[in-house]
Amino acid sequence: MKNSLFAKTFAALILSSFLVLSAGTANAKRLTAAVADWTGGELTCQVAVAILEEELGYRIDRIEFASGTGLWEAIAAGDIDFACESWPSYAEADDVMLNTNLIYDGEVVKEYSGDGSVDAYTTGIIGMSDYYVPKYFVDANPDFKDWSDLNKYKDQFATPETGSKGRLIGCPVAGWNCHDQKRLDLLGIDFQADELGTEAAAIAEAVAAYERKEPFLLYLWEPHWFFGAYDMVGVKLPAHKTCDSFTEANNWKDCGTAAWPATGWAKDYTFNYGNPATFAKPENAKAAEFFTKMKFDNADQAVMLVEVKQKNRDLKEVVKEWKDANPDKWKNWIPK
Protein backbone atom coordinates (compact mmCIF):
# COMPACT_ATOMS: atom_id res chain seq x y z
CA MET A 1 0.00 0.00 0.00
CA LYS A 2 2.82 2.33 0.94
CA ASN A 3 4.58 1.55 -2.32
CA SER A 4 1.33 2.01 -4.21
CA LEU A 5 0.74 5.42 -2.61
CA PHE A 6 4.31 6.44 -3.40
CA ALA A 7 3.90 5.31 -6.99
CA LYS A 8 0.67 7.28 -7.39
CA THR A 9 2.21 10.37 -5.81
CA PHE A 10 5.30 10.10 -7.98
CA ALA A 11 3.17 9.62 -11.11
CA ALA A 12 1.09 12.66 -10.19
CA LEU A 13 4.22 14.76 -9.76
CA ILE A 14 5.55 13.62 -13.13
CA LEU A 15 2.22 14.39 -14.81
CA SER A 16 2.07 17.79 -13.12
CA SER A 17 5.59 18.63 -14.25
CA PHE A 18 4.78 17.49 -17.78
CA LEU A 19 1.66 19.65 -17.89
CA VAL A 20 3.59 22.68 -16.63
CA LEU A 21 6.31 22.15 -19.21
CA SER A 22 3.75 21.58 -21.95
CA ALA A 23 1.90 24.73 -21.00
CA GLY A 24 5.17 26.67 -20.98
CA THR A 25 6.06 25.36 -24.42
CA ALA A 26 2.61 26.06 -25.77
CA ASN A 27 2.66 29.59 -24.39
CA ALA A 28 6.23 30.34 -25.49
CA LYS A 29 6.61 33.35 -27.75
CA ARG A 30 7.30 31.87 -31.17
CA LEU A 31 8.74 33.39 -34.30
CA THR A 32 9.75 31.90 -37.63
CA ALA A 33 13.09 32.92 -39.12
CA ALA A 34 14.49 32.34 -42.60
CA VAL A 35 17.99 30.86 -42.47
CA ALA A 36 20.31 32.80 -44.79
CA ASP A 37 21.85 30.93 -47.70
CA TRP A 38 25.37 32.31 -47.18
CA THR A 39 27.61 31.96 -44.14
CA GLY A 40 27.83 35.63 -43.15
CA GLY A 41 24.06 36.04 -43.15
CA GLU A 42 23.64 32.78 -41.27
CA LEU A 43 26.04 34.03 -38.58
CA THR A 44 24.18 37.32 -38.21
CA CYS A 45 20.87 35.49 -37.90
CA GLN A 46 22.21 32.93 -35.41
CA VAL A 47 23.47 35.76 -33.20
CA ALA A 48 19.96 37.26 -33.26
CA VAL A 49 18.29 33.89 -32.67
CA ALA A 50 20.58 33.02 -29.75
CA ILE A 51 19.77 36.27 -27.98
CA LEU A 52 16.04 36.09 -28.71
CA GLU A 53 15.86 32.55 -27.33
CA GLU A 54 18.30 32.72 -24.44
CA GLU A 55 17.71 36.25 -23.19
CA LEU A 56 14.17 37.18 -24.29
CA GLY A 57 12.37 33.85 -23.97
CA TYR A 58 11.39 33.29 -27.60
CA ARG A 59 11.29 30.03 -29.46
CA ILE A 60 12.54 30.47 -33.02
CA ASP A 61 11.59 28.04 -35.76
CA ARG A 62 14.19 28.09 -38.53
CA ILE A 63 13.32 27.59 -42.19
CA GLU A 64 15.85 27.33 -45.02
CA PHE A 65 14.81 29.86 -47.63
CA ALA A 66 16.89 31.30 -50.47
CA SER A 67 17.34 35.07 -50.44
CA GLY A 68 15.56 37.13 -53.04
CA THR A 69 12.14 38.38 -53.98
CA GLY A 70 10.41 35.18 -52.85
CA LEU A 71 11.64 35.72 -49.30
CA TRP A 72 10.45 39.33 -49.23
CA GLU A 73 7.04 38.19 -50.41
CA ALA A 74 6.91 35.38 -47.82
CA ILE A 75 7.62 37.89 -45.05
CA ALA A 76 5.09 40.37 -46.42
CA ALA A 77 2.49 37.58 -46.47
CA GLY A 78 3.27 36.58 -42.88
CA ASP A 79 4.52 33.10 -43.78
CA ILE A 80 7.92 33.97 -42.29
CA ASP A 81 8.32 36.45 -39.45
CA PHE A 82 11.85 37.72 -40.09
CA ALA A 83 15.09 37.23 -42.01
CA CYS A 84 18.58 38.61 -41.56
CA GLU A 85 21.24 40.62 -43.36
CA SER A 86 19.69 41.60 -46.65
CA TRP A 87 22.13 43.34 -49.00
CA PRO A 88 20.51 46.30 -50.81
CA SER A 89 22.75 46.00 -53.86
CA TYR A 90 21.60 42.41 -54.26
CA ALA A 91 17.99 43.49 -53.92
CA GLU A 92 18.54 46.34 -56.37
CA ALA A 93 19.39 43.86 -59.09
CA ASP A 94 15.94 42.34 -58.90
CA ASP A 95 13.24 44.07 -60.95
CA VAL A 96 10.65 43.61 -58.23
CA MET A 97 12.94 45.32 -55.75
CA LEU A 98 13.69 48.40 -57.83
CA ASN A 99 12.60 51.33 -55.69
CA THR A 100 14.16 54.41 -54.14
CA ASN A 101 13.89 53.20 -50.57
CA LEU A 102 16.96 50.99 -50.40
CA ILE A 103 19.53 51.14 -47.61
CA TYR A 104 22.24 51.92 -50.11
CA ASP A 105 25.14 54.27 -49.51
CA GLY A 106 23.50 55.64 -46.37
CA GLU A 107 19.90 55.83 -47.55
CA VAL A 108 17.67 53.93 -45.10
CA VAL A 109 14.62 51.97 -46.23
CA LYS A 110 11.62 51.44 -43.99
CA GLU A 111 9.31 49.60 -46.32
CA TYR A 112 9.13 47.02 -49.06
CA SER A 113 7.90 48.15 -52.49
CA GLY A 114 6.62 51.37 -50.92
CA ASP A 115 3.61 49.76 -49.27
CA GLY A 116 4.90 49.17 -45.74
CA SER A 117 4.52 45.38 -45.95
CA VAL A 118 7.99 44.75 -44.52
CA ASP A 119 9.90 46.63 -41.83
CA ALA A 120 13.70 46.90 -41.95
CA TYR A 121 16.28 47.33 -39.20
CA THR A 122 19.96 48.03 -39.88
CA THR A 123 22.23 45.20 -38.71
CA GLY A 124 25.52 47.04 -38.23
CA ILE A 125 27.10 44.93 -41.00
CA ILE A 126 28.23 47.33 -43.73
CA GLY A 127 29.20 45.91 -47.08
CA MET A 128 32.28 47.68 -48.45
CA SER A 129 34.53 47.07 -51.43
CA ASP A 130 37.97 48.55 -52.03
CA TYR A 131 41.47 47.68 -53.17
CA TYR A 132 43.62 46.45 -50.29
CA VAL A 133 47.32 46.11 -49.53
CA PRO A 134 48.93 44.14 -46.68
CA LYS A 135 49.62 46.12 -43.54
CA TYR A 136 53.26 45.01 -43.62
CA PHE A 137 53.61 46.94 -46.91
CA VAL A 138 52.20 50.10 -45.29
CA ASP A 139 54.45 49.64 -42.26
CA ALA A 140 57.49 49.33 -44.52
CA ASN A 141 56.45 52.38 -46.57
CA PRO A 142 55.12 55.02 -44.14
CA ASP A 143 54.72 57.59 -46.94
CA PHE A 144 52.02 55.44 -48.53
CA LYS A 145 48.66 56.99 -47.65
CA ASP A 146 46.06 56.00 -50.25
CA TRP A 147 45.37 55.03 -53.89
CA SER A 148 47.04 58.21 -55.19
CA ASP A 149 50.41 56.88 -53.97
CA LEU A 150 50.21 53.54 -55.78
CA ASN A 151 52.24 54.67 -58.81
CA LYS A 152 55.18 55.62 -56.56
CA TYR A 153 55.43 51.99 -55.51
CA LYS A 154 54.27 50.21 -58.68
CA ASP A 155 57.64 48.48 -59.12
CA GLN A 156 56.99 46.57 -55.90
CA PHE A 157 53.68 45.32 -57.32
CA ALA A 158 54.98 44.50 -60.82
CA THR A 159 55.23 40.92 -62.11
CA PRO A 160 56.88 39.41 -65.21
CA GLU A 161 53.43 39.39 -66.84
CA THR A 162 52.67 43.07 -66.13
CA GLY A 163 56.13 44.40 -67.04
CA SER A 164 56.59 47.94 -65.75
CA LYS A 165 53.01 48.13 -64.51
CA GLY A 166 51.85 47.10 -61.07
CA ARG A 167 49.43 44.20 -60.74
CA LEU A 168 45.94 44.27 -59.23
CA ILE A 169 44.41 40.93 -58.26
CA GLY A 170 41.08 42.14 -59.50
CA CYS A 171 37.42 41.39 -59.16
CA PRO A 172 37.45 37.68 -60.06
CA VAL A 173 34.35 37.36 -62.25
CA ALA A 174 33.58 39.48 -65.32
CA GLY A 175 29.86 39.20 -64.68
CA TRP A 176 30.23 41.22 -61.49
CA ASN A 177 30.92 44.31 -63.62
CA CYS A 178 33.56 45.77 -61.31
CA HIS A 179 35.30 47.63 -64.19
CA ASP A 180 38.71 47.37 -62.52
CA GLN A 181 40.84 48.22 -65.56
CA LYS A 182 38.58 51.11 -66.53
CA ARG A 183 38.83 52.46 -62.98
CA LEU A 184 42.61 52.14 -62.91
CA ASP A 185 42.89 53.94 -66.26
CA LEU A 186 40.51 56.76 -65.33
CA LEU A 187 42.36 57.36 -62.08
CA GLY A 188 45.76 57.22 -63.80
CA ILE A 189 46.91 54.23 -61.75
CA ASP A 190 49.58 52.46 -63.82
CA PHE A 191 48.47 48.95 -62.86
CA GLN A 192 47.09 46.02 -64.81
CA ALA A 193 43.95 44.28 -63.52
CA ASP A 194 44.27 40.50 -63.45
CA GLU A 195 40.92 38.68 -63.46
CA LEU A 196 41.41 35.12 -62.19
CA GLY A 197 37.91 33.77 -62.77
CA THR A 198 36.93 32.69 -59.25
CA GLU A 199 37.03 34.08 -55.74
CA ALA A 200 38.99 31.01 -54.61
CA ALA A 201 41.72 31.62 -57.19
CA ALA A 202 42.06 35.30 -56.26
CA ILE A 203 42.23 34.51 -52.54
CA ALA A 204 44.78 31.74 -53.13
CA GLU A 205 47.05 34.22 -54.95
CA ALA A 206 46.69 36.72 -52.11
CA VAL A 207 47.38 34.14 -49.39
CA ALA A 208 50.50 32.90 -51.18
CA ALA A 209 51.82 36.46 -51.57
CA TYR A 210 51.01 37.28 -47.93
CA GLU A 211 52.88 34.22 -46.68
CA ARG A 212 55.91 35.29 -48.75
CA LYS A 213 55.50 38.83 -47.33
CA GLU A 214 55.33 40.27 -50.85
CA PRO A 215 53.41 43.46 -51.70
CA PHE A 216 50.13 42.84 -53.53
CA LEU A 217 47.01 44.83 -54.40
CA LEU A 218 43.72 42.97 -54.01
CA TYR A 219 40.10 43.73 -54.82
CA LEU A 220 37.93 42.44 -51.98
CA TRP A 221 34.79 43.19 -50.04
CA GLU A 222 33.90 43.31 -46.37
CA PRO A 223 32.89 41.45 -44.35
CA HIS A 224 35.03 38.54 -45.55
CA TRP A 225 36.88 35.83 -43.66
CA PHE A 226 40.15 37.04 -45.22
CA PHE A 227 40.13 40.11 -42.95
CA GLY A 228 39.76 37.90 -39.89
CA ALA A 229 42.92 36.01 -40.83
CA TYR A 230 45.16 38.62 -42.50
CA ASP A 231 45.92 42.24 -41.64
CA MET A 232 44.97 44.38 -44.64
CA VAL A 233 44.59 48.13 -45.31
CA GLY A 234 42.21 49.71 -47.83
CA VAL A 235 43.67 52.22 -50.31
CA LYS A 236 40.59 54.47 -49.91
CA LEU A 237 39.37 54.84 -53.47
CA PRO A 238 37.48 58.09 -54.15
CA ALA A 239 34.04 58.17 -52.53
CA HIS A 240 31.28 56.53 -54.54
CA LYS A 241 29.50 58.80 -56.98
CA THR A 242 27.28 58.15 -59.97
CA CYS A 243 25.89 60.29 -62.75
CA ASP A 244 22.84 60.22 -65.00
CA SER A 245 24.40 59.55 -68.39
CA PHE A 246 25.06 55.90 -69.20
CA THR A 247 27.20 54.53 -72.03
CA GLU A 248 25.74 51.15 -72.94
CA ALA A 249 28.60 50.22 -75.26
CA ASN A 250 31.16 50.49 -72.47
CA ASN A 251 28.77 49.41 -69.70
CA TRP A 252 29.84 52.25 -67.42
CA LYS A 253 28.55 55.67 -66.51
CA ASP A 254 30.41 58.20 -68.60
CA CYS A 255 30.85 61.42 -66.68
CA GLY A 256 34.58 61.71 -66.32
CA THR A 257 36.75 60.93 -63.34
CA ALA A 258 34.24 62.35 -60.87
CA ALA A 259 31.95 59.34 -61.03
CA TRP A 260 31.66 55.60 -61.43
CA PRO A 261 33.70 53.66 -62.26
CA ALA A 262 36.50 56.08 -61.41
CA THR A 263 35.14 56.18 -57.88
CA GLY A 264 34.80 53.38 -55.36
CA TRP A 265 31.75 51.31 -54.61
CA ALA A 266 28.67 52.34 -52.67
CA LYS A 267 28.40 51.01 -49.13
CA ASP A 268 25.73 48.40 -48.44
CA TYR A 269 24.02 49.10 -45.13
CA THR A 270 22.60 45.63 -44.61
CA PHE A 271 19.41 45.08 -42.68
CA ASN A 272 17.28 42.54 -40.86
CA TYR A 273 13.66 42.63 -41.95
CA GLY A 274 10.34 41.37 -40.64
CA ASN A 275 6.57 41.38 -40.92
CA PRO A 276 5.12 44.58 -39.38
CA ALA A 277 1.94 42.87 -38.14
CA THR A 278 4.01 40.24 -36.31
CA PHE A 279 6.19 42.78 -34.55
CA ALA A 280 3.23 45.04 -33.73
CA LYS A 281 1.82 42.35 -31.42
CA PRO A 282 2.31 43.13 -27.70
CA GLU A 283 4.05 39.80 -27.08
CA ASN A 284 6.65 40.68 -29.73
CA ALA A 285 7.37 44.23 -28.57
CA LYS A 286 10.71 43.23 -27.04
CA ALA A 287 11.77 41.41 -30.20
CA ALA A 288 10.92 44.49 -32.26
CA GLU A 289 12.93 46.72 -29.91
CA PHE A 290 15.81 44.25 -29.98
CA PHE A 291 16.03 44.47 -33.77
CA THR A 292 16.12 48.28 -33.62
CA LYS A 293 19.11 48.05 -31.24
CA MET A 294 21.06 45.15 -32.73
CA LYS A 295 24.36 46.38 -34.17
CA PHE A 296 26.65 43.53 -35.15
CA ASP A 297 29.84 44.57 -36.96
CA ASN A 298 32.19 43.55 -39.76
CA ALA A 299 35.18 42.79 -37.55
CA ASP A 300 33.28 40.37 -35.32
CA GLN A 301 31.73 38.61 -38.29
CA ALA A 302 35.09 38.31 -40.07
CA VAL A 303 36.66 36.54 -37.08
CA MET A 304 33.68 34.18 -36.86
CA LEU A 305 33.86 33.51 -40.60
CA VAL A 306 37.44 32.30 -40.19
CA GLU A 307 36.32 29.81 -37.55
CA VAL A 308 33.43 28.49 -39.65
CA LYS A 309 34.78 28.63 -43.21
CA GLN A 310 38.49 28.00 -42.68
CA LYS A 311 38.52 25.86 -39.55
CA ASN A 312 35.25 24.04 -40.33
CA ARG A 313 33.83 24.62 -36.87
CA ASP A 314 30.14 24.32 -36.04
CA LEU A 315 28.44 27.66 -36.66
CA LYS A 316 26.24 27.56 -33.55
CA GLU A 317 29.24 26.72 -31.40
CA VAL A 318 31.15 29.70 -32.82
CA VAL A 319 28.20 32.02 -32.14
CA LYS A 320 27.90 30.71 -28.56
CA GLU A 321 31.61 31.33 -28.05
CA TRP A 322 31.25 34.90 -29.36
CA LYS A 323 28.18 35.53 -27.17
CA ASP A 324 29.94 34.24 -24.05
CA ALA A 325 32.97 36.44 -24.75
CA ASN A 326 31.13 39.65 -25.69
CA PRO A 327 28.34 40.44 -23.21
CA ASP A 328 29.44 44.08 -23.24
CA LYS A 329 28.29 44.26 -26.88
CA TRP A 330 25.03 42.34 -27.07
CA LYS A 331 23.65 43.35 -23.67
CA ASN A 332 23.21 46.85 -25.08
CA TRP A 333 20.75 45.37 -27.59
CA ILE A 334 18.45 43.98 -24.88
CA PRO A 335 15.29 46.03 -24.22
CA LYS A 336 15.23 47.61 -20.75
Residue ranges of each PLM-predicted region?
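A conserved helix-loop-strand patch within extracytoplasmic ligand-binding domains
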Residues: G106-L168
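C-terminal lobe and pocket-closing loops
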Residues: G228-F290, M294
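A bilobed periplasmic-binding-protein/Venus flytrap-type ligand-binding module shared by bacterial periplasmic
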Residues: I126-D139, D268-E283, V306-E307
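Short, polar/charged alpha-helical segment
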Residues: G40-Y58, L184
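Pocket-flanking alpha-helical
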Residues: C45, I63-K110, E205, W225-Y230
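Ligand-binding pocket segment of bilobal, Venus flytrap-like solute-binding proteins
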Residues: W72-W87, R167-F246
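Short, well-ordered beta-strand elements
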Residues: A28-G40, Y58-E64, K165-I169, F291
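An extracytoplasmic/periplasmic, membrane-proximal ligand-sensing/linker region
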Residues: G40, G175-F191, L196-K213, H224-W225, ...
